[in-house]
From Swiss-Prot:
The keyword Iron-sulfur does not apply. Pathway: Amino-acid biosynthesis; S-adenosyl-L-methionine biosynthesis; S-adenosyl-L-methionine from L-methionine: step 1/1. One of its GO terms (biological process) is one-carbon metabolic process. One of its GO terms (molecular function) is ATP binding. Keywords: ATP-binding, Cytoplasm, Magnesium, Metal-binding, Nucleotide-binding, One-carbon metabolism, Potassium, Transferase. This is S-adenosylmethionine synthase. The keyword Repeat does not apply. K(+) binds at E43. Its cofactor is Mg(2+); K(+). It comes from Ruminiclostridium cellulolyticum (strain ATCC 35319 / DSM 5812 / JCM 6584 / H10) (Clostridium cellulolyticum). GO terms for cellular component: cytoplasm.
């Protein structure tokens, strides 16, 4: 078989772009706690000593956005000036408008309802909030039905955060990144070739200490021993120093880590970010639905690998296209799989929202360490509750 290497990265919750994603989703959650019918498109930018929150929000409730921002930054861990960013002293500016009435008229009532093809009662008759294409993916490389490189990368950054917050490695700071290169034999992952960890740290710790502690407390507990060998390469803070980090080191923006959020580059991406968007925005809800479809297909045993593309027109409820690609791993014809998808999954925006129960304040948790491959109860798109029906109808 042909051997090849594939690499994915993850970032910690203290990475500047991820700070922005979490603030945007924390604002969405705060609004959804009071008004689950709100329309929210919230963007955030951070830089040294400053946060800017902007966007289009239509709601009947009041949310103290600066308070939400400061609480989010505090929970991430930037609560002291010596970390380069302080939740209590940073400036917070807001610029919020209502959703455009031109967009709202298409979301409020789908084209199908306007021309009599769908009644108001049919799945609330709302249209897609924008045009675009979204991808969902699943494969049998890991128990999470995700590609191995991104799962390992996320587990490393989650462990980095854990040992920082529980005090096991006291000198760690919130900003950090991981990168994992996996060697494949054909399409099977067989070993980890390279691990890269870069973590912000206090100024008074030696590089040797950091290398030792990260190996002992982060890498060894996370990467399965059978995937490591004498040829595995480790790069821990390879620049030699990472004291200046977070918004002091780099500015951050919502939506700049879309590959980290999804499949680590292993599957295609439609380009739309998730955080700060309510589920009438198909960038988010349809990407979740596409993952739900793909994961149930793989969980059913119909295919070992599956990618689903959905595409929408603004103001129109039904997808303009649905494509299922199993990369030659399916045990039944793909035409049959497409029939099963059309039968078992309603992919109109309001149907997705209802099926996955998306009008809930569940989004802050999604904004770090990946939107997919998680077993948290709130991640309804990770359920495999359609797999049995698909398996039965496929005759497996």
């Amino acid at each position: 078989m042909t051997k090849r290497l594939f690499t994915s990265e993850s970032v910690t919750e203290g990475h500047p772009d991820k700070i922005c994603d979490q603030i945007s989703d924390a604002v969405l959650d705060a609004i959804y706690e009071k008004d689950p019918q709100a329309r929210v498109a919230c963007e955030t930018a951070v830089t040294t000593g400053m946060v800017m929150v902007m966007g289009e929000i239509t709601t009947n409730c009041y949310v103290d956005i600066p308070k939400v921002v400061r609480n989010t930054i505090r929970e991430i861990g930037y609560d002291r000036a010596k970390y380069g960013f302080d939740c209590d002293t940073c400036a917070v500016m807001t610029s919020i408008d209502e959703q455009s009435s031109d967009i709202a008229m298409g979301v409020d009532k789908a084209l199908e309802a306007k021309v009599g093809e769908m009644s108001e009662e049919q799945v609330q008759a709302i249209g897609a909030g924008d045009q675009g294409m979204m991808f969902g993916f699943a494969c049998d490389e890991t128990p999470e039905l995700m590609p191995m490189p991104i799962i390992l990368a996320h587990k490393l950054t989650m462990k980095l955060s854990e040992v920082r917050k529980n005090g096991k490695v006291k000198y760690l700071r919130p900003d950090g990144k991981s990168q994992v290169t996996v060697e494949y034999d054909g399409d099977k992952p067989v070993r980890v070739d390279t691990v890269v960890i870069s973590t912000q740290h206090g100024a008074d710790v030696s590089h040797d200490t950091i290398e030792k502690d990260i190996m002992e407390h982060v890498i060894i507990p996370v990467i399965p021993r059978e995937l490591l060998d004498e040829g595995t390469k480790y790069f821990i803070n390879p620049t030699g120093r990472f004291v200046v980090g977070g918004p002091q080191g780099d500015s951050g923006l919502t939506g700049r880590k879309i590959i980290v959020d999804t499949y680590g580059g292993y599957a295609r991406h439609g380009g739309g970010a998730f955080s700060g968007k309510d589920p009438t925005k198909v960038d988010r809800s349809a990407a979740y639905a596409a993952r739900y479809v793909a994961k149930n297909i793989v969980a059913s045993g119909i295919a070992r690998k599956c990618e689903v593309q959905l595409a929408y027109a603004i103001g129109v409820a039904k997808p303009v296209s649905v494509l299922v690609d199993t990369f030659g791993t399916a045990v039944i014809p793909e035409e049959k799989i497409s029939e099963l998808v059309n039968k078992h999954f309603d992919l109109r925006p309001a149907a997705i929202i209802n099926k996955l129960n998306l009008r809930r304040p569940i989004y802050r948790k999604t904004a770090a360490y990946g939107h997919f491959g998680r077993d948290d109860a709130e991640f309804s798109w990770e359920k495999t509750d359609v797999a049995d029906a698909l398996r039965k109808e496929a005759g497996l």
